[in-house]
UniProtKB/Swiss-Prot annotation:
Extra facts: It is not sensitive to fructose-1,6-bisphosphate (FBP).
Entry keywords, A to Z: ATP-binding, Glycerol metabolism, Kinase, Nucleotide-binding, Transferase
Lineage, uppermost ranks: Archaea, Methanobacteriati, Methanobacteriota, Thermococci, Thermococcales
Species per Swiss-Prot/TrEMBL record: Thermococcus kodakarensis (strain ATCC BAA-918 / JCM 12380 / KOD1)
Protein name per UniProt: Glycerol kinase
NCBIfam families: glycerol_kin, PRK00047.1
């Protein structure tokens, strides 16, 4: 009987389930969206029951579309939107909505903590204190949900990120992995344990915390009434770390970029815990008794800039049109677009930056705007890669995400980086990474060497641009960024006058 691995890919807007075989081929997919809830401006929540319902339906659809029986599934891997914070009781019943990673309700609280404890938090967790991470969200829940802190003190509350909630519902086990724990701002990435000083700082009782395990081991077995079989749940990693694993980036210096609404770039630093002023240090995964680390750069707006061309100023109807428009021009004739709609992420970290389009003349048309948008994505990626290069030597960039279908963008990315950009055959690298981690735990795959041999390039984009042109274009980009930075402060100052 042929066996398969099931990957659960729980994102910010939808829950997906994908079934892979030993050669990494996809046999079945299920996907269901779930609603976002916005109770106040800047607040973002999910209903955990809606997440669970969407995930369970996606699993059943994937099994059905693959035309297999549940007992043909050798293992289940979980990957998830990171940082999103949930609390539930011992019966698995949610005690409040999930507070989503995008939610800014704790921004002021974190700013106060950052002023006094920012350096200490960065040294312990590798993270720059921000409302993005789980610690302040959990503190808010304990302080604001009636009766929750009292229940927590009695050991009746369980906290976790989305992976932990799904694994608890599937198996009854309260666990997470190193990669997800490292995004809570409560986990000491050197000691590999919850940090007492941080728990005290955020006033969080240890009893609510899950057990932290490796990213590839059997955490438990699915309850038979759910799927009709007891299947080992044996892989767990946050979405960006799972994508790094799915790209078979197992050695130091191997880097991947995921192009989505924003972009995330991770470089494997292996056993080295490296610190950068402008990048996050995080755990990539725990495997076979050792932990691998990574540096991460988060870019807030990339694909969202293309969506703005479509939905905001309506100069395109489909994202794919940008490639055709961009290739109509031999050059962009000095037009730059800095898509700092919500500030700039790595390596600038300027929340007061705002979007600008600069270099416009009477001859500027929608071709220039489309091209400037795609070029901005590549420039922003180079900004992060250059920062990584200060600490780690980088030879090539492996890419995934929807925008990788755009050949103009991929070629320009190779040109502006002066490095190969490699697009893999299997585009579902996040789900594939979780599947690999699950399969390794049950000997479905032997080791990472076998997985590295399975990874195949669909196309390699070689740099073609001469150095003089490349550096002239990039210098123009850096000048454009300077003009975008701090713009919200300029506007506020003008208002107050």
């Amino acid at each position: 009987m042929e066996k398969f691995v099931l990957s659960l890919d729980e994102g910010t807007t939808s829950a997906r389930a994908i079934i892979f075989d030993r050669e990494s081929n996809i046999h079945g997919i299920g996907q269901y969206e779930f609603p976002q809830h916005y109770p106040r401006p800047g607040w973002v929540e999910h209903n955990p029951e809606e997440i669970w319902d969407a995930q369970l339906r996606a699993i059943k659809d994937a099994i059905q579309s693959a035309r297999i029986e549940p007992n043909q599934i050798a293992a289940i891997g979980v990957t998830n939107q990171r940082e999103t914070t949930l609390v539930w009781d011992k019966d698995g019943k949610p005690l409040y909505n999930a507070i989503v990673w995008q939610c800014r309700r704790t921004a002021e609280m974190v700013e106060e903590i950052k002023r006094e404890y920012g350096t200490m938090i960065k040294e312990k967790t590798g993270l720059v204190p921000d409302a993005y991470f789980s610690a302040s969200k959990l503190k808010w829940l304990l302080d604001n949900v009636p009766g929750l802190r009292e229940k927590a003190e009695k050991g009746e509350v369980m906290f976790g990120t989305v992976d932990t909630f799904l694994i608890y519902r599937l198996t009854g086990e309260h666990v997470t992995d190193y990669s997800n724990a490292s995004r809570t701002m409560l986990f000491n990435i050197k000691k590999l344990d919850w940090d007492d000083e941080l728990l005290e700082l955020f006033d969080i009782p240890e009893s609510v915390l899950p057990e932290v395990r490796e990213s590839s081991e059997v955490y438990g077995y699915t309850k038979k009434e759910l799927l009709g079989a007891e299947i080992p749940v044996s892989g767990d990693a946050g979405d960006q770390q799972a994508a790094l694993f799915g790209q078979a980036a197992f050695e130091a210096g191997m880097v991947k970029a995921t192009y989505g609404t924003g972009s995330f770039i991770l470089v494997n630093t292996d056993k080295m815990v490296l610190y950068s002023d402008n990048l996050l240090t995080t755990i990539a995964w725990g495997l076979n008794g050792r932990v691998s680390y990574a540096l991460e750069g988060s870019i807030f707006v990339t694909g969202a800039a293309v969506q703005w061309l479509r939905d905001g100023i309506k100069i395109i109807k489909h994202a794919s049109e940008t490639e055709e428009l961009a290739t109509k021009l031999e050059s962009n004739e000095g037009v730059y677009f800095v898509p700092a709609f919500v500030g700039l992420g790595a390596p600038y970290w300027d929340q007061f930056a705002r979007g600008i389009i600069i270099g416009i003349t009477r001859g500027t048309g929608r071709e220039h705007l489309a091209r400037a948008t795609l070029e901005a994505i590549a420039y922003l990626t180079r900004d992060v890669v250059d920062e990584m290069e200060k600490l780690v030597q980088i030879k090539e960039l492996r890419v995934d995400g929807g925008a990788t279908a755009n050949d103009f963008l991929m070629q320009f990315q190779a040109d502006i980086l002066n490095r190969k950009v490699i697009r893999p055959v299997v585009k579902e690298t996040t789900a594939l990474g979780a599947a690999y981690l699950a399969g390794l735990a049950v000997d479905y795959w032997a080791d990472t060497r076998e997985i590295a041999e399975l990874w195949k390039a669909e196309r390699i984009f070689e740099p073609k641009m001469d150095e003089k042109t490349r550096e002239r274009l990039y210098k123009g980009w850096k000048e454009a960024v300077k003009r975008a930075m701090g713009w919200a402060k300029v506007v506020d100052s003008a208002k107050s006058n």
